[in-house]
């Protein structure tokens, strides 16, 4: 990938474009992310950078993590992530990656952990059809057939069943960057992105450009 950054989802709002049209946007506090380690082909077998984001009290980190940050000369952060960037050699340890690495009009992919919905049935979890809601029917929101009796006389693997919904890594592709506010490290993305407010998100240039 060419560029990437970690950020915190702040919430949604709406703005007006130059034609007066209302655009729903998600506000993301993107960075600053500090480079704390560089991976090289000679030492690690591949090239990448390790970045840290988000303040945290030092006493909440264990000694190995504190030592890792001390070696880089950087204050302890909450999140650590590794990116394989094309120009990782141009970045130095201690350098900050900020929101202005992206520009308005660019397309990005955003990853995050989706909101947890708890235990849900097949109608909400998989968009299954309901049964008849009247005329004497006793089948309304049940699962339905899970496998015939004599053949195959079992339930196949990966059958769509009730269960835990949400709280999984989710990526939304090809979202538009509407506006950058560099002095506040804010990126405004058209539409919604995965996760709750204050959730961690990863922004990178899109793979489908």
Curated annotation (Swiss-Prot):
Q: Which organism is it from?
A: Clostridium botulinum (strain Hall / ATCC 3502 / NCTC 13319 / Type A)
Question: Which superkingdom, per the lineage?
Answer: Bacteria
> What function does the entry list?
One of the primary rRNA binding proteins, it binds directly near the 3'-end of the 23S rRNA, where it nucleates assembly of the 50S subunit.
Q: Which UniProt keywords apply?
A: Ribonucleoprotein, Ribosomal protein, RNA-binding, rRNA-binding
UniProt GO cellular component terms: cytosolic large ribosomal subunit
Give the span(s) annotated as Disordered. Answer: 141-163
Quaternary structure? Part of the 50S ribosomal subunit. Forms a cluster with proteins L14 and L19.
- Protein known as: Large ribosomal subunit protein uL3
Q: Name one GO molecular function term.
A: rRNA binding
Q: Which family does it belong to?
A: Belongs to the universal ribosomal protein uL3 family.
Q: Which GO terms describe its biological process?
A: translation
HAMAP family per record? Ribosomal_uL3_B
């Amino acid at each position: 990938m060419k560029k990437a950054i970690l950020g915190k989802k702040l919430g949604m709002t709406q703005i007006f474009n130059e034609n007066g049209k209302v655009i729903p946007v998600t506000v993301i506090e993107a960075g600053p992310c500090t480079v704390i380690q560089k991976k090289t082909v000679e030492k690690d077998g591949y090239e990448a950078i390790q970045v840290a984001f988000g303040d945290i009290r030092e006493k909440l980190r264990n000694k190995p993590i504190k030592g890792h940050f001390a070696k880089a000369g950087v204050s302890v952060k909450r999140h650590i992530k590794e990116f394989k960037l094309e120009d990782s050699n141009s970045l130095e340890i201690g350098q900050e990656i900020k929101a202005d690495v992206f520009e308005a009009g660019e397309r990005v992919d955003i990853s995050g952990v989706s909101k947890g919905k708890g235990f849900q049935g097949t109608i909400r979890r998989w968009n299954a059809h309901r049964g008849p809601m009247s005329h004497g029917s006793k089948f309304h929101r049940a699962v339905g057939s899970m496998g015939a009796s004599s053949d195959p006389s079992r339930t196949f693997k990966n059958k769509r069943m009730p269960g835990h919904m949400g709280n999984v890594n989710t990526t939304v592709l090809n979202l538009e960057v509407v506006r950058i506010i560099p002095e506040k490290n804010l990126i405004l993305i058209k539409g919604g992105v995965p996760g709750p407010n204050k959730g961690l998100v990863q922004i990178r240039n899109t793979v489908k450009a």
